[in-house]
């Protein structure tokens, strides 16, 4: 097993190379570029330059798509806008040499006032993913998309749903272990290993505050939480762990050091 640790975020384009150098000096080997509100790397040459530097430093890049996406919106225009945002990430990601574009799949449709239509939601999101993958193939972009496990119970993204999407579309996946804990109130590592048998895992991890309805906010990752995660991860996979806590750089370094001592 090999695990690469790193934070979410690379900062503005003008300082991105310096940021990567800083991550490298700390021993970090992964970084997720957070396009939280927009795809702010516009220029193909900028993307190639950042990607070249990351490759030189042995840092694996990934992308997080904008948060304002929903492949299950009732409105076709919003579904199309979601696909465009994800595809914009894929185009830039191709030039960056990024491995995956992580995204939040969408919200559940409702059958009635209080009942989610999980089956219809799955089929709509699946169709959106297939259309996105078709565009990726058409453009010959070397990147995959990774729907993320989600931390709120009213949002599509249980481990079962993400696993099924992966199996039926060939998309990748992002296992957010903080989200899984918030949603399920515990993490069943054996079940996760059985559902996700691929050799490459992309994961998020941080401390999290949650309630009855799931995720509330991220917090600093505790030493004991890192140990619990790392001792339960499979030993036969290549794994990237992106930390999203308020202190994500130091938390990533701490996770790396704990892993080195296991």
Which residues fall in each region the model found?
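Acidic-and-aromatic substrate-binding clefts and catalytic sites of carbohydrate-active enzymes
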Residues: 10-16, 35-46, 71-74, 109-111, ...
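Gly/Pro-rich active-site loop or hairpin
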Residues: 159, 179-240, 246-247
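C-terminal helical cap(s) of enzyme catalytic domains, especially alpha/beta-barrels
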Residues: 249-262
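Hydrophobic faces of well-ordered beta-strands that scaffold small-molecule active sites
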Residues: 3-9, 31-33, 61-65, 101-103, ...
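Active-site acidic/histidine proton-transfer and metal-coordination neighborhood
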Residues: 55-56, 72-175, 182
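N-terminal pre-domain/capping segments
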Residues: 1-65, 69-71, 76-88
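Acidic (Asp/Glu)-rich catalytic clusters
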Residues: 20-27, 42-62, 88-97, 130-140, ...
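Expand to "…catalyze enediolate/carbanion chemistry for C-C bond making/breaking, isomerization
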Residues: 15, 20, 83-86, 119-122, ...
């Amino acid at each position: 097993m090999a695990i690469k640790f790193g934070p979410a975020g690379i900062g503005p384009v003008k300082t991105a190379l310096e940021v990567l150098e800083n991550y490298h000096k700390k021993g970090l080997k992964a970084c997720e570029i957070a396009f939280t509100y927009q795809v702010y790397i516009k220029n193909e040459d900028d993307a190639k330059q950042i990607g070249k530097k990351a490759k030189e430093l042995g840092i694996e890049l990934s992308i997080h798509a904008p948060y304002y996406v929903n492949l299950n919106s009732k409105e076709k225009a919003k579904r199309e806008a979601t696909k465009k945002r994800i595809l914009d990430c894929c185009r830039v990601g191709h030039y960056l040499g990024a491995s995956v574009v992580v995204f939040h799949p969408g919200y559940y449709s409702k059958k009635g006032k209080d009942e989610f239509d999980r089956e219809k939601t799955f089929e709509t999101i699946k169709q959106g993913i297939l259309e996105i993958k078709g565009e990726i193939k058409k453009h010959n972009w070397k990147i995959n998309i990774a729907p993320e496990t989600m931390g709120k119970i009213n949002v599509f993204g249980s481990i079962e749903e993400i696993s099924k999407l992966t199996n039926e579309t060939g998309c990748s996946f992002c296992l957010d272990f903080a989200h899984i804990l918030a949603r399920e109130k515990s993490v069943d590592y054996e079940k996760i290993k059985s559902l996700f048998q691929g050799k490459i895992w992309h994961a998020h991890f941080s401390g999290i505050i949650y309630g009855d309805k799931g995720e509330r906010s991220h917090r600093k990752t505790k030493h004991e939480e890192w140990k619990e995660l790392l001792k339960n991860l499979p030993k036969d996979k290549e794994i990237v762990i992106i930390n999203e806590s308020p202190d994500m750089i130091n938390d990533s370094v701490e996770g790396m050091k704990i892993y080195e001592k296991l």
